[in-house]
Amino acid sequence: MEEGLQRCFVLHRRPYSESSLILDVFSEEYGRLSIISKGARSKRSNLKGVLQAFTPLLMKWSGKGSMRTLRQAETISLGIPLTGINLYSAMYINELLVRVVEQETPYPALFLDYLTALTELAQSTNPEPALRRFELALLSAMGYGVDFLHCAGSGEMVSPEMTYRYREQQGFMASIRHDPLMSFKGNELIAISERRFTTPEQLKAAKRFTRIALKPYLGGKPLKSRELFLPRTRSILK
C-alpha cells in the first residue's frame, strides 16, 4: 500500500547496508514510523541533504508492517535554524518522542506541538519555556491527566500561596509539610496549567513535575542526548 505525500519530520537516522538509511519519522497523520530509504547514501542520490532532522518534509512511502519503504521525499521549506543550546534542546525533544511515543499511533495535535516547539526554540534565547510546554503536551497526548487547578482532597480551587504535595494517581493535596521534590506552590500549579511561566521558580517547578511524570515512560535508561551537552546545557535538561 502506498500513501500520498505526508507532512513529516525525521527524528533519527542511521546507516543501513552500504548505501541506505533507516529513518525514524514523525508524521502528522500516521505518528511515528520506521522507514528505509534505499540508496539515500549513494553519491548519486537526489536525497542528499533532504532527509535531515528539523527540516519540514513531504514524504511518500509504501509497504506494511514495522518497516516501510520510502518512495519520495521533498522539503517543504528550509530547515528550522537551531544552534547551540537550542539545537541540543531540539535533539532532546526528538529523543523524547522516540522513547515515549509508540509507533503506528497518530498524534496530529502533538505533531503541531512539536512544530511549535521547534519554532519557539529557533526564536528564543532561553529554551526552557518551550521545553516545558512540549513536555506537558507530550504527557497530555499520552493520556497523563492531572488537574493542576483543584485540590485532590477537597475539590477546591488551588490557592496561589498555599503548598500542595503531588501524589501520583491522585493529584495535588494541600499540605503544611514541604517536600523538596513533590511540593508545589499554588501559583506554580496555575502557571503549569496555563503553560505560561513568568518566574524562574515556576519554570523550575514545571521541570520537577515533568521529570516525575516522564519517569515511568523513560524507565531507568538515560537519555543519550544529554551526553552531548556542555555543562551549561545540562542544568536545563537534567
From Swiss-Prot:
Signal peptide: none annotated. The keyword Isomerase does not apply. It holds the Pfam family RecO_N. The keyword DNA damage applies. InterPro entries: ARFGAP/RecO, DNA_rep/recomb_RecO_N, NA-bd_OB-fold, RecO, RecO_C. One of its GO terms (biological process) is double-strand break repair. Keywords: DNA damage, DNA recombination, DNA repair. One of its GO terms (cellular component) is bacterial nucleoid. Involved in DNA repair and RecF pathway recombination. Belongs to the RecO family. This is DNA repair protein RecO. It comes from Aliivibrio fischeri (strain ATCC 700601 / ES114). The gene is recO.
